[in-house]
Amino acid sequence: MRLDVECDGGSRGNPGIAGCGSSVLDGDQEVAARWEFISKATNNVAEYQGLINALELAIDVAGMRGVSPAELEIQVRMDSKLVVEQMSGRWKIKHPDMKPLAARVKELEATLAAVSYN
């Protein structure tokens, strides 16, 4: 099974009041969405949290359809060059705030058939 996810995060101030949103699409139809208020965070933390939420939500959608994560392919669309490059392995993860978030993304990715970023 293949699902697309779109996610974004942002902050007012950096750090500042932050939030993120994620949606799961099956073809061109949105099948699930989630928004989260993050209190105070940087833009990059909000972007990572949006990705984590998107992956978790896609796994939940697949589960409701009787599909295991191991059978799920996810195409991620997001505008954060930092997150895309780090998760694609092209950039190092240097900032200590990013490391646990990136580790959580990698944990989720390890349960899936495939994840691609664009």
Regions found by a protein language model. Give the residues of each.
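RNase H-like nuclease fold core
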Residues: 1-45, 49, 53-63
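RNase H catalytic domain
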Residues: 10-14, 51-118
